[in-house]
Swiss-Prot record:
<keyword id="KW-0963">Cytoplasm</keyword>
<keyword id="KW-0456">Lyase</keyword>
<comment type="similarity">
    <text>Belongs to the lyase 1 family. Argininosuccinate lyase subfamily.</text>
</comment>
<dbReference type="InterPro" id="IPR020557">
    <property type="entry name" value="Fumarate_lyase_CS"/>
</dbReference>
<dbReference type="InterPro" id="IPR022761">
    <property type="entry name" value="Fumarate_lyase_N"/>
</dbReference>
<dbReference type="InterPro" id="IPR000362">
    <property type="entry name" value="Fumarate_lyase_fam"/>
</dbReference>
<dbReference type="GO" id="GO:0004056">
    <property type="term" value="F:argininosuccinate lyase activity"/>
</dbReference>
<dbReference type="GO" id="GO:0006526">
    <property type="term" value="P:L-arginine biosynthetic process"/>
</dbReference>
<dbReference type="InterPro" id="IPR024083">
    <property type="entry name" value="Fumarase/histidase_N"/>
</dbReference>
<dbReference type="InterPro" id="IPR008948">
    <property type="entry name" value="L-Aspartase-like"/>
</dbReference>
<keyword id="KW-0055">Arginine biosynthesis</keyword>
<dbReference type="GO" id="GO:0042450">
    <property type="term" value="P:arginine biosynthetic process via ornithine"/>
</dbReference>
<dbReference type="Pfam" id="PF14698">
    <property type="entry name" value="ASL_C2"/>
</dbReference>
<protein>
    <recommendedName>
        <fullName>Argininosuccinate lyase</fullName>
        <ecNumber>4.3.2.1</ecNumber>
    </recommendedName>
</protein>
<comment type="pathway">
    <text>Amino-acid biosynthesis; L-arginine biosynthesis; L-arginine from L-ornithine and carbamoyl phosphate: step 3/3.</text>
</comment>
<dbReference type="Pfam" id="PF00206">
    <property type="entry name" value="Lyase_1"/>
</dbReference>
<keyword id="KW-0028">Amino-acid biosynthesis</keyword>
Length: 470
C-alpha cells in the first residue's frame, strides 16, 4: 500500500525488501512512552502558540493517551508497513480522530522527534542503572563491614603479594562503582538539552516555543543548534562508553569470584540458587552467573564499537544509518542491568571461607615487604639495600622450606648480622595488615573509616529517582 505519511511524491509503493530493511518498529516500539510524552508536550506548545486550536489539542492529547493505554495493555497492533513507532502512533491517531491528527506533526520532523525520544529513554535508563548500582554498593558495603579485619592475600600478577583485608579488597570495587555512578550523572547533565523543535535540520518558520517543550519534558534547556540537535549521538556513544566501563568493573569482580570459588582457592562458596550443574559430571557446581557477566562484557564492548563505526563517516545532518543506534543501546542497557542484578544476587548469597583466606595469606612470603620496611626503619638501610637483603632472606627461607617467621634469628644473621629479635614482631600477617595505616591503606581501622565514608556517600548521594527529579 502507499505510505499515507510520506508517500505524496511517490508513484509506487516501497518493495517488500525496502519495507523489510527500512522498518524499525520491531525494536523502536520500546520508545512508545517517550514518543507519546514528547508528542503531548509538542501538542501543548502548538496550542499555547495558537498554531492549532485548543479543541484540536484536546482531541490529539486524548487520542495519544488512549493509544498509550492500548500499547501498555498489549491491545495495540503494530505494523511494519508504518516503519517506526512515530508513524504507527500517528497512523492510529488519524484512525481515531481523523485528519486533525496530521496537525500534530506541524513544526517538527521525525529527526528531532526520535532524538528527543531517545534522550528521554536514555535518561530514564540512567535512573534505573544508578539505582541498581547503589543497591550493589550497599551489598558490597555490608560484606566489607562484616569482614573489615578478615585477612586474605592481596595479589599482583595473580601471585600473592601482601596480606590485605577482604573488607579493603571489596571497598576497591565500591570505589569503582562510585566512579561509574559519577559518570552516569555527568552524562545526564551533558545530554539534558531538548532537541524538540529543531525539525529536520534547519529549525522551523512556525512561531514555536522550544523552551516550553524542554520544560515540559524536564530538560535543562533546548539544544543550541538545530543541525547538531538532530545529528548528535554523542550521548549514545557516552552511554555505551559508561556501560562498557561499568561492565568491565563487574567483569573483574566476576573473574575473582570464579577464581575464589574454585578448588584451588576455596575462598568463597556460592549459593546453589546462583550456580548451575553439569549434564555429565554430577559433582560440578559451576559459577555460571559470574561467567555470563564476564561473557556479556564483550557484547557491551561491541555495542560501543558498533555505534562509533556507524557515526564516524556521517556528514551533517541526519542519515538513515543513525537508525542503527537503537538496538545496541537497548541491548547494552538491558544486559548491564541484568548483570548488576546478578552480581548483587551472587554477593548476597555468598559464604566467606575465612580460614582458607588466612592460610593463603600466610604463604609465599607475603610479609617480605614488611621485613624490608623494618630493615629501613630499624637498621638505617636504604630501601634498595633492604630490598636486596630481604630477597636473600626469602631465598634462605625457600632453601629451608619454611616461612619467614619460622627462620631462626641465627639463620637471618647469616644474611645481615645486625638484625635483632624485634624483627619477628612484624612477620605475622596480622601485624602486617595492622601496620598499613596510611590513608586508603588496608589496616582494619582504615577499613572501618572507609565504610563510614561509604555509608555517608550512599545516604547523601543525589540520585535521579524519577523523571520528576530531572
Amino acid at each position: 500500500m502507499k505510505n499515507p505519511l510520506w508517500g505524496g511524491r511517490f508513484t509506487v509503493s516501497p518493495s517488500d525488501i525496502m519495507k523489510k530493511i527500512n522498518e524499525s518498529i520491531s525494536f523502536d516500539k520500546i520508545l512508545y512512552e517517550e514518543d507519546i510524552s514528547g508528542s503531548i508536550a509538542h501538542c501543548k506548545m502548538l496550542v499555547n502558540q495558537k498554531i492549532i486550536s485548543k479543541y484540536e489539542g484536546q482531541l490529539i492529547i486524548h487520542g495519544l493517551e488512549v493509544i498509550q493505554n492500548q500499547i501498555s495493555s498489549g491491545t495495540f497492533e503494530f505494523s511494519t508497513d508504518l516503519e517506526d513507532i512515530h508513524m504507527n502512533i500517528e497512523h492510529h491517531l488519524k484512525k481515531m480522530i481523523g485528519n486533525i491528527a496530521g496537525k500534530l506533526h506541524t513544526a517538527r520532523s521525525r529527526n528531532d522527534q526520535v532524538a528527543t525520544d531517545f534522550k528521554l529513554w536514555i535518561r530514564k535508563s540512567i535512573v534505573k542503572l544508578e539505582t541498581l548500582l547503589h543497591e550493589l554498593q550497599q551489598t558490597i558495603l555490608n560484606i566489607a563491614e562484616a569482614n573489615y579485619d578478615t585477612i586474605m592475600p592481596g595479589f599482583t600478577h595473580l601471585q600473592i603479594a601482601q596480606p590485605v583485608t577482604l573488607g579493603h579488597h571489596l571497598m576497591a570495587y565500591f570505589e569503582m562503582l562510585k566512579r561509574d555512578c559519577s559518570r552516569w550523572q555527568d552524562l545526564h547533565k551533558r545530554m539534558n538539552q531538548c532537541p524538540a523543535g529543531s525539525a529536520a535540520l534547519a529549525g522551523t518558520s512556525f512561531p514555536i516555543d522550544r523552551h516550553f517543550i524542554a520544560q515540559e519534558l524536564k530538560f535543562d534547556s533546548p539544544t543550541e543548534n538545530s543541525i547538531d540537535a538532530v545529528s548528535d549521538r554523542d550521548y549514545v556513544i557516552e552511554f555505551l562508553s559508561n556501560a562498557s566501563i561499568c561492565i568491565m568493573h563487574l567483569s573483574r569482580l566476576a573473574e575473582e569470584i570464579i577464581l575464589w570459588c574454585s578448588y584451588n582457592f576455596k575462598f568463597i562458596t556460592l549459593s546453589d540458587n546462583i550456580t548451575t550443574g553439569s549434564s555429565i559430571m554430577p559433582q560440578k557446581k559451576n559459577p555460571d552467573a559470574a561467567e555470563l557477566i564476564r561473557g556479556k562484557t564483550g557484547r557491551i564492548f561491541a555495542s560501543l564499537n558498533q555505534i562509533l563505526v556507524v557515526m564516524k563517516g556521517l556528514p551533517l545532518a541526519y542519515s538513515k544509518d543513525m537508525q542503527e543506534d537503537k538496538e545496541p543501546v537497548f541491548d547494552a542497557a538491558n544486559n548491564l542491568m541484568l548483570c548488576i542484578e546478578a552480581m548483587n544476587s551472587m554477593l548476597n548469597n555468598i559464604t566467606i571461607n575465612k580460614s582458607n583466606m588466612l592460610k593463603a595469606a600466610e604463604h609465599d612470603y607475603s610479609t617480605a615487604t614488611d621485613l624490608a620496611d623494618w630493615l629501613v626503619k630499624n637498621l638505617n638501610l636504604s630501601f634498595r639495600e633492604s630490598h636486596e637483603t630481604t630477597g636473600q632472606i626469602v631465598k634462605l627461607a625457600e632453601q629451608n622450606h619454611c616461612k619467614l617467621h619460622e627462620l631462626t634469628l641465627e639463620q637471618m644473621k647469616t644474611i645481615i648480622p645486625s638484625i635483632t629479635e624485634d624483627v619477628f614482631s612484624i612477620l605475622s600477617v596480622k601485624n602486617s595488615v595492622d601496620s598499613r595505616t596510611s590513608y586508603g591503606g588496608t589496616a582494619p581501622a582504615n577499613v572501618i573509616e572507609a565504610i563510614k565514608r561509604g555509608k555517608l556517600y550512599l545516604s547523601n548521594i543525589t540520585t535521579l529517582h524519577s523523571e520528576n527529579n530531572m
